[in-house]
Amino acid sequence: MERSDSRDLYNFVRASSLDKNSTLFDASQYEFFGQNLDDMELGGLDDDGVIAPVLGHADDDEYHLFDKGEGAGLGSLSDMDDLATTFAKLNRVVTGPKHPGVIGDRGSGSFSRESSSATDWTQDAELTSWLDEQDQEAKRWSSQPQSFAHSKPLYRTSSYPQQQPQLQHYNSEPIILPESNFTSFPPPGNRSPQASPGNLHRAPSLPGGSQLTYSAPSPLSNSGFHLSGLSQGPHYGGNLTRYASCGPTLGNMVQPHWVTDPGHLHGDHSGLLHNLVQQQHQQLPPRNAIMSQHLLALQQRQSYAQLAALQSQLYSSYPSPSRKVPFGVGEVREHKHKSSHRSRKNRGLSQQTSDAASQKSETGLQFRSKHMTSEEIESILKMQHSNSHSNDPYVNDYYHQAKLAKKSAGSKAISHFYPAQLKDHQPRSRNSSEQHPQVHVDALGKITLPSVRRPHALLEVDSSPGFNDGSGDHKGSGKHLEQEPLVAARVTIEDALGVLIDIVDIDRTLQNTRPQDGGAQLKRKRQILLEGLATALQLADPFSKTGQKSGMTAKDDIVFLRIATLPKGRKLLTKYLQLLVPGTENARVVCMAIFRHLRFLFGGLPSDTLAAETISNLAKAVTVCVQAMDLRALSACLAAVVCSSEQPPLRPIGSSAGDGASVVLISLLERAAEVVVVPRVMHGNSNDGLWRASFDEFFNLLTKYCRSKYDTIRGQNQGSAADVLELAIKREMPAELLRASLRHTNDDQRNYLLNFGRKPSAISESASHARGGQINSESVRG
C-alpha cells in the first residue's frame, strides 16, 4: 500500500477538525492500570514564544492505520495537537524500557504505542510551510477560552518501581532495522541529501504492534505532529559498510573510539553521546529561528542513531528497547547540565573498567579487584605460596622421612631427619587462661587452635531461672567446662605432648648438627621445657629445699592422678620419663610420684590390650630411669613407697592381675644393692642412713603383706593336699621381691624370715629359699 504524502494527511486532519461532534481531549479521565494521576502536573517548554516542532519517521504500519479509514476516530485538529503534545511529553519523561499500555480511547478509535528509541529526522521542501501551518494552529489553540489549571499530563504505564529523571539516556543495545523506501513527512520526492543519512537507522521498541501516544493540550507548549516507526519482527540485518558513509564524524572518529575504548562496552553510554551532541551544537550557528533549532535536533538524532547502530553492528548484542528523547528548543538547553554531569560520571566508570581490563591483559591472571592492583594481589599470592609450600621435608613429609631414618639407623648413612627451624616458645603462665583465644588460619586454610583450653560448644542452652534453684547437682553442672576434672586433664595432656614434640626436635637437631656454641643454648632450652612440664604436672617434692618433708596430703598429686587416669596421660608420663636426663632432679621427682601411687598405676591390668601395653611400657620406663639413680634418689623413691597412703600391690612376677609394681620395686632394690657397696668401702656416707631407714620400713611392709597373704591362702585351702597348698603359695607369694630384699636385710630380719615358715613344709621351703638368698647375699658382700 502506498504511503500518503504529508499534504494529504494534513488536509485530512483539518477536515476531521470540522466535525461538529468532536470534543476537546480531557486527560483527567484516564488512569493507567489503576494508578491515580492526581499528583501529576502538566509541563511544557520554557519559552512561550518559540514553537519547537517535533518531526519523525512513520513506519508502514502506521500509514496502514490511516489508510484503513480509521482517521475519523482521531477527533478534531485540537485533539490531534493535544495528542502530539502528549507524545512529545511522554518521550521527554520516559527514560527506560516500558511495557505497553493503553493511553486513550476516543470515540471509535483506540490507539496506543510502546516506548521507542530515538528516531531519524529528515527535511524537505515543504518543511517551512508545514511549520507555518502548525504555528497558526497553535495560536488558534491559545485563543480558546479553556482553563488548563486542572489538566494533568499522561504518563506511560510501566512496571519499573521508579521513574528516572535522566532524559539523554540511551540503551547500549539498539536494534538495527532495514532501510525503508520512504521517509517521514514530507514525501520521498523532495528529500534533502543532507538529511538522508539519518534514515539509515531506526530503533524500535519492544515488539508488540504499532501504537500512538496521546497527551493533554497545553497553552504553553505546542509541537508538531509526530509519528514514529515501530518494528514488527526481528529486523537485525544491515551492513556495516553503509554506516561508514554517514560522514567523517562517524566513520573516522566514532568507530575507532568504540573499538579502542573498553570502558564503553559496559554500562551507560550517555557520556559519549553527550559529547557528540556538544560537538554538533558547537558547529551550528546561534539558534535564532525555528529552522536552526530543528536542524540542531536533526543532527543530534542522526548522531545518536548512527552511533547506536554502529555499536549493535560491531558487538552483535541482543535487541532491547531503546529510549526516545525528542529534543526541542527548551530540552537541549534544559538538560545540558544533567548530561554533562552523567558524562563525567560515566567517564570515571569507564576509566575504572579500562584499568581492570588492562590489569587482566598484562598479568594474564583471571581475577579482578576493586581496591587492589594486580601487583598487590601477586605479592599476596607469593606470600601465601611461600607459607604453604615449605621446602622442609621434616614438616611436609614427616612420616616418610621418619621411616627412612628408622631404616638407616643401623647404617652409616647420614640422617637428615631433623627440623630446619625450631619453634619459638613464648613464655606463658599456666594459670593465665585467655578469655578469647586467637584462632590462627594457616596458608592452606586450616584453622588451628593454640590449645584445647577453649573448645567450641556444640550446643548452647540457656537454662531457665528456676533450674538452678533445685538441688546442688544442678548448681554444680553449671560450672565452666574447663573446670571439669577430666577436661582439664585432657587440656594439660595436649599441651604437654606439644612440649615433648619440641624437645624431640631439639634432640634431633643436636644429634645431626654442630652448633657454634656446642649446643649449649639448645640444651638450656631443652632443660627449661622439661622443668616447665614438671611444674605443669604440679608434682610434690618433699625433699626439695623449699618443700616440706612431712605433712603431705592426698590432694598434692591431684593433677598427676587425673592425667594418669587416662591412657593418653600414661603415654605422656612414659614419654616424659624417656626424655628426662637420668639422675636429674626432675627424674627423681617424677619417679617419686609414681612410687607414691603404685596401686593407682599398677593395681589392675585393663582388658584392653593397648591400655595394658601402656602400663607395661610405663613400668619399663621407670625401671630404666631408676637404673641411673644415686643412693639418695633411690632412698627417696623407697621412702615414697613407705609413706604412701595406699598399700602397693606386691604380686609375683607374671601375675595375671599385673606385676608392674613388683617390677619397679625389684629394679630399685637391685640398683640399691649395686650402689650401697660403695659407701661401705668408703666407710661412711650420710645417704646410707636414709636408705637404711627407708628399707627397714619397706621390709616391715613386705613381711606384713607376706604374713597376711599366707594366712589367707591357708584359710582357703584347709583340708587340701600339701601339693595344692604349695602351688597356691607359689602363685600368690612375691618370692622374687623377697629374694631381692635379702641383700639389704640385717640379722634380725634374716632370723624372722627363718622362723616364718617352720610349720608346713611349703612355708619351710619358702623360708629356706629366703635364708639361702640371704646367705648368698652376705657371702657376696663379704
UniProtKB/Swiss-Prot annotation:
Keyword Lipoprotein: no
Tissues in which the UniProt entry reports expression: Expressed in root vasculature, shoot apical meristem (SAM) and leaves.
Deletion consequences: Enhanced root distal stem cell differentiation and increased mitotic activity in root quiescent center.
Coiled coil, from the record: none
One BP term from GO: mRNA processing
InterPro entries associated with the record: Pat1-like
Signal peptide: none
Compositionally biased tracts (Basic and acidic residues): 471-481
Comp. bias intervals (Low complexity): 108-117
Polar residues bias (residue ranges): 208-217, 348-366
Gene Ontology, cellular component aspect: endoplasmic reticulum; Lsm1-7-Pat1 complex; nucleus; P-body
Subunit and partners: Interacts with AFPH2/NINJA.
Name of the protein in question: Protein PAT1 homolog 1
Source lineage: Eukaryota, Viridiplantae, Streptophyta, Embryophyta, Tracheophyta
